[in-house]
Amino acid sequence: MASGREEFVYMAKLAEQAERYEEMVEFMEKVSAAVDGDELTVEERNLLSVAYKNVIGARRASWRIISSIEQKEESRGNDDHVTAIREYRSKIETELSGICDGILKLLDSRLIPAAASGDSKVFYLKMKGDYHRYLAEFKTGQERKDAAEHTLAAYKSAQDIANAELAPTHPIRLGLALNFSVFYYEILNSPDRACNLAKQAFDEAIAELDTLGEESYKDSTLIMQLLRDNLTLWTSDMQDDAADEIKEAAAPKPTEEQQ
């Protein structure tokens, strides 16, 4: 008979196959409760990440669509529609806050304290940065400022460990650089810092590409491609700032991040 932990992992995989990600989150939260201070396995932490990424990803996509419609209706002067849209957007934001709060509590109370290896510490600190960044995407005023500060602190802690303990080609280190650079570009409006960080990570990985093991080659090269795509997009934006600001206001271009 499988242990409770193994049973929950199996059920999480089943929920993933069925694309029932809210239930996948519930099963993986049960797994993290069952480990009793131990570290999650690589498979378990990846399942947890996939579960939360899908649950939050659906709401982030909804929020972007609704915000875009809100801008259009505002420009047309449809005040009644704008009021209804804002109420609906607020509902989505409540869901986003709840999801982020859930994983951030789990990270702070269990996952980060139990992390022993360098790659797991970076993995969870990056995750902490990611979910504070998702809060910063829609929060305003002091709440946005706080979320941005928490994001920066988590990413910097992860970066310190990654630079000391992980190879430049390690997919977790590359994924951190990708998402950290997106944070600089989208949340802090610092395209220079974003480009510098992404370029440095890409160049350092290219220099050691021949050391890449077969198992992580695909993951690492995929993230390197995303870094390069963002650099291309951002540098073209910076070269034509005035025109691009108009384009972005009408139809924001998605910046790629690690899924």
Swiss-Prot record:
In terms of SUPFAM superfamilies, this protein maps to:
14-3-3 protein (SSF48445)
Instruction: List the transmembrane segments.
Output: none
Where it sits in the cell: the answer is:
Nucleus; Cytoplasm
Keywords, in A-Z order: Cytoplasm, Nucleus, Phosphoprotein
Post-translational modification Phosphoserine, affected residues: 67, 109, 190
Spell out the InterPro entries in the cross-references.
Answer: 14-3-3, 14-3-3_CS, 14-3-3_dom_sf, 14-3-3_domain
The organism sits in which domain of life? Eukaryota
Q: Which residues carry this modification: Phosphothreonine?
A: 211
**UniProt-listed GO biological process terms:** brassinosteroid mediated signaling pathway
One GO cellular component from the entry? plant-type vacuole
Task: Cite the record's note on assembly.
Answer: Interacts with CINV1.
Please give the function described in this protein's UniProt entry: Is associated with a DNA binding complex that binds to the G box, a well-characterized cis-acting DNA regulatory element found in plant genes.
Q: Which family does it belong to?
A: Belongs to the 14-3-3 family.
Question: What is the protein named?
Answer: 14-3-3-like protein GF14 omega
Give the organism, scientific name: Arabidopsis thaliana
